[in-house]
């Protein structure tokens, strides 16, 4: 479990500002009393996701699988293939049946659109509590 004094940095990628806002609003600033505050790095393009992840310091990446022109599943696969120490990735899928695509991308979790705050919160909590690989 992360150090409770250092804020957790969550990268949120979508080309749609409303999707990014829904994700951040669903998670809030404090997901659970046992975890530190959450801070967000909003990203609207695929190249910026890669740049931010290369810089490091991200505790979790939430990638929109429906983003265009670069979808979050392809980015997730690229990050898992290229980063020696990649943080957990959650992919937002277009529908529940797309979970298999998220598995292909090597993302640790998938949550379907539209974002359900309870499902997203539980999923993110489990990823942030999981031991680092």
Curated annotation (Swiss-Prot):
Keywords: Phosphoprotein, Two-component regulatory system. GO terms for cellular component: peptidoglycan-based cell wall. SUPFAM superfamilies: CheY-like (SSF52172). It comes from the Bacteria. Residues 9-128 form the Response regulatory domain. The modification 4-aspartylphosphate is found at residue 64. InterPro entries: CheY-like_superfamily, Sig_transdc_resp-reg_receiver. One of its GO terms (biological process) is phosphorelay signal transduction system. The keyword Phosphoprotein applies. This is Uncharacterized response regulatory protein Rv3143. It comes from Mycobacterium tuberculosis (strain ATCC 25618 / H37Rv).
């Amino acid at each position: 479990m992360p150090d409770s004094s250092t804020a957790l940095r969550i990268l949120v990628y979508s080309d749609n500002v409303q999707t990014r806002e829904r994700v951040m609003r669903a998670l809030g600033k404090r997901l659970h009393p046992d975890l530190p505050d959450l801070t967000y790095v909003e990203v609207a393009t695929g190249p910026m996701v890669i740049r931010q992840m290369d810089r490091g310091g991200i505790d979790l990446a939430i990638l929109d699988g429906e983003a265009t022109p670069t979808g979050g599943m392809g980015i997730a696969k690229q990050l898992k293939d290229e980063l020696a120490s990649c943080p957990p990735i959650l992919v937002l899928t277009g529908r529940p049946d797309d979970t298999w695509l998220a598995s292909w991308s090597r993302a640790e979790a998938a949550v379907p659109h539209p974002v359900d705050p309870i499902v997203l919160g539980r999923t993110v909590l489990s990823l942030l509590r999981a031991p680092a690989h």
